[in-house]
Each structure stands twice: as C-alpha cells, then as structure tokens.
Swiss-Prot record:
It comes from Prochlorococcus marinus (strain MIT 9301). GO terms for biological process: translation. Pfam families: Ribosomal_S13 (PF00416). Belongs to the universal ribosomal protein uS13 family. PANTHER family: 30S RIBOSOMAL PROTEIN S13/40S RIBOSOMAL PROTEIN S18, SMALL RIBOSOMAL SUBUNIT PROTEIN US13M. The gene is rpsM. One of its GO terms (cellular component) is cytosol. Part of the 30S ribosomal subunit. Forms a loose heterodimer with protein S19. Forms two bridges to the 50S subunit in the 70S ribosome. InterPro entries: Rbsml_uS13_C, Ribosomal_uS13, Ribosomal_uS13-like_H2TH, Ribosomal_uS13_bac-type, Ribosomal_uS13_CS. Residues 91-121 are annotated as: Disordered. Keywords: Ribonucleoprotein, Ribosomal protein, RNA-binding, rRNA-binding, tRNA-binding. The lineage of its organism: Bacteria, Bacillati, Cyanobacteriota, Cyanophyceae, Synechococcales. Residues 100-121 have a biased composition (Basic residues). GO terms for molecular function: rRNA binding; structural constituent of ribosome; tRNA binding. This is Small ribosomal subunit protein uS13. Located at the top of the head of the 30S subunit, it contacts several helices of the 16S rRNA. In the 70S ribosome it contacts the 23S rRNA (bridge B1a) and protein L5 of the 50S subunit (bridge B1b), connecting the 2 subunits; these bridges are implicated in subunit movement. Contacts the tRNAs in the A and P-sites.
C-alpha cells in the first residue's frame, strides 16, 4: 500500500480515486495533483513506481491535509463560538447555521424528536 499524508491508500483502486481517501483531497484536487505530477489517473495504485509515489507525496505536501485540516476547521468553529457571533451561537446550540427554518425540518441538526405530553382539556 502506498502511504500518502499518513494514510494508506487502497492498492486496487485507480490513483485518481485512491487519493480521495486522504481527508482534504477530493476528486478535483486529485485530478490537479495528477496533472501536475504527470501520473496517469487510470493507473492502479499497486502499479505505481516508487518515483511516482514520491512525486505524489511531494505534490500533496503543499496542501493542508488530514489532522492539520481538521484542527484548522475546529479552530475556525471555536473562534466563531468564542467571539459570540450568531454563527457561533447556532453551532453551540446545534441548530442550522445558514438561515434555514427550524419550526419544521432541521431534524438532522437538532436530533431526534423530544416527546411533549399533550395538554388535557
């Protein structure tokens, strides 16, 4: 297995797809990396030469990936919460952040329904 950015990428997949197993590399960025390094996207990972793997490692080092990217995103959310802006408060309360309605829907973000007893008449 080739190891890129601390992740073992699957041997049987095409390089173009296998690179997407690294957090922070999607299909578009994978294609960009392969174009810059000159590696054929249709090659299987198991068929890559050591020099190809080294090229890919070098190309991925210029991006923020894996743990660093997760930490960066976490710090951005923490900053929003610390300054007390609306987005930060919505994140803290586990509500939709981007203006969606919450009277109905938003079940994924709010969690499962809390049962409320009906009022007797």
């Amino acid at each position: 297995m080739a190891r890129i950015a601390g992740i073992d990428i699957p041997r049987e997949k095409r390089v173009e797809i296998a690179l997407t197993y690294v957090y922070g590399i999607g299909l578009t960025r994978s294609k960009l990396i392969l174009a810059n390094t000159g590696v054929n996207p249709d090659t299987r990972v198991k068929d890559l030469s050591d020099s190809d793997v080294q090229k890919l490692r070098g190309a991925t080092e210029e991006f923020t990936l894996e743990g660093d990217l997760r930490r960066k995103e976490g710090m951005a959310l923490k900053r929003l919460q610390d300054i007390g802006c609306v987005r930060g408060r919505r994140h803290r309360m586990s509500l939709p952040v981007r203006g969606q309605r919450t009277r109905t829907n938003a079940r994924t973000r709010r969690g499962s329904r809390k049962t409320v007893a009906g009022r007797k008449k």
